[in-house]
Swiss-Prot record:
GO terms for biological process: viral RNA genome replication; viral translational frameshifting. Belongs to the influenza viruses PA-X family. This is Protein PA-X. The record marks K202, K203, K206 as: Important for efficient shutoff activity. The active site is at E80, D108. It comes from Influenza A virus (strain A/USA:Memphis/10/1996 H1N1). Plays a major role in the shutoff of the host protein expression by cleaving mRNAs probably via an endonuclease activity. This host shutoff allows the virus to escape from the host antiviral response. Hijacks host RNA splicing machinery to selectively target host RNAs containing introns for destruction. This may explain the preferential degradation of RNAs that have undergone co- or post-transcriptional processing. InterPro entries: PA/PA-X, PA/PA-X_sf. The gene is PA. The probable endonuclease active site in the N-terminus and the basic amino acid cluster in the C-terminus are important for the shutoff activity. The C-terminus acts as a nuclear localization signal. The C-terminus is recruited to host protein complexes involved in nuclear Pol II RNA processing. It is found in: Host cytoplasm; Host nucleus. GO terms for molecular function: RNA binding. The record marks R195, K198, K199 as: Important for efficient shutoff activity and nuclear localization. Pfam families: Flu_PA.
Length: 252
């Protein structure tokens, strides 16, 4: 699973997921399913905000990354992917600027057009069950919830899906592709079932022992762009360059 994640997600997303797991004291070598889930969630959050801007009239518009008007205000502020201290700093700044009610839990995005925080969910189960779990945890009508599944289903607060159909279709297609790629590698069942995950972990550990040399070499690969992209991500003036450059899963 770890190899799959490193092959199928942008290196920047992988790095952010690694930092998140380290912050919570989790070992990605053991919690490989969580590693994959975090990367998937991060990518959905990025794709959710891709190309969406607000023009001078306050209207939401879609602009491709090569468009010269890309200096327009981003519609969404991405909170997910930052360390907790920085994330809460961003949330507090938004609340002070917009007058929005401070959420009890860290949300994933802020929508400047609708003036609301958004909680994004990606589930391997039934969307309505996961939605209810999220709603019960958050217990706030101010935070908008939007759930996606790997089967193409979605559910949102008051059936308000925020994005246009094409943008949501991109997310659904990507999730379906991830599912297919996992299935082709025999990883999907373990990703869905904790019991199967334990079996897969034993296989992975055994495989790592047999070919430790090659895996160590692969795990150390770095992208020259990371040092350039990181400040772009942490700075509020991030661009669509990173978010539009997601790597496609290589064929098995």
């Amino acid at each position: 699973m770890e190899d799959f994640v490193r092959q199928c997600f942008n290196p920047m997303i992988v790095e952010l997921a690694e930092k998140a797991m380290k912050e919570y004291g989790e070992d990605l070598k053991i919690e490989t399913n969580k590693f994959a889930a975090i990367c998937t969630h991060l990518e959905v959050c990025f794709m959710y905000s891709d190309f969406h801007f607000i023009n001078e009239q306050g209207e939401s518009i879609i602009v491709e990354p090569e468009d010269p008007n890309a200096l327009l205000k981003h519609r969404f502020e991405i909170i997910e992917g930052r360390d907790r201290t920085m994330a809460w700093t961003v949330v507090n700044s938004i609340c002070n600027t917009t007058g929005a009610e401070k959420p009890k839990f860290l949300p994933d995005l802020y929508d400047y057009k609708e003036n609301r925080f958004i909680e994004i969910g990606v589930t391997r189960r039934e969307v309505h069950i996961y939605y209810l779990e999220k709603a019960n945890k958050i217990k706030s009508e101010k935070t908008h919830i939007h759930i996606f599944s790997f089967t193409g289903e979605e559910m949102a607060t008051k059936a308000d899906y925020t994005l246009d159909e094409e943008s949501r279709a991109r997310i659904k297609t990507r999730l379906f592709t991830i599912r297919q790629e996992m299935a082709s590698r025999g990883l999907w069942d373990s990703f869905v079932s904790p019991r199967e995950a334990k079996k897969q972990l034993k296989k992975d550990l055994k495989s790592q022992e047999q070919c430790a040399g090659s895996l160590t070499k692969a795990s150390r690969r770095t992208s020259p762009a990371l040092r350039i992209l990181e400040p772009m991500w942490m700075d509020s003036n991030r661009t669509a360059t990173l978010r539009a450059s997601f790597l496609k899963c290589p064929k098995k």
